């Protein structure tokens, strides 16, 4: 068990064996935040850091190809203020991308009580998401504001 603050979370690892071969670790969650969200995960494909924000509620960034110490250094040392913030510091995410050019960074923004409002991919291309008055996904737009997908909700009443 790994301690985080006054909480304890299990160190989670997954192992596999192919045929009669040796067991190998395929997933290892090395570090957690104060609420138990994974912060640093090592898989066969490589290492991934997850940065949470919006007071620990939502994923703000997924950083592939960097260690937690590299991310901490790029973010100015302490990750807690970033994670506790009601909205993430966008300037820190921009600096993170500049400081870790070898990493593949995907970042997310959210509208409270609704959902994801934007996703910025590792190339810096942004997809925007809009919602209707009932908080249903209404439209997905590209980096230039052009509609990529539109959603139309039609309900019918079955008459018996």
What would you call each of these model-derived segments?
Residues 1-121, 126-160:
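Beta-strand elements of repeat-based all-beta scaffolds
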């Amino acid at each position: 068990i790994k301690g985080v603050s006054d909480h304890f979370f299990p160190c989670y690892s997954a192992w596999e064996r192919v045929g009669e071969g040796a067991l190998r670790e395929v997933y290892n969650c090395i570090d957690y935040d104060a609420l138990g969200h994974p912060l640093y995960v090592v898989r066969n494909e490589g290492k991934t850091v997850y940065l949470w924000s919006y007071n620990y509620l939502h994923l703000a960034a997924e950083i592939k190809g960097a260690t937690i110490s590299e991310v901490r250094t790029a973010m100015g040392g302490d990750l807690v203020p970033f994670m506790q913030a009601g909205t993430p510091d966008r300037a820190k995410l921009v600096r993170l991308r500049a400081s870790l050019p070898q990493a593949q960074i995907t970042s997310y923004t959210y509208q409270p009580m609704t959902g994801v409002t934007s996703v910025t991919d590792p190339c810096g291309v942004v997809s925007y998401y809009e919602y209707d008055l009932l908080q249903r996904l209404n439209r997905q737009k590209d980096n230039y504001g052009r509609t990529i997908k539109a959603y139309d909700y039609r309900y019918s009443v079955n008459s018996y």
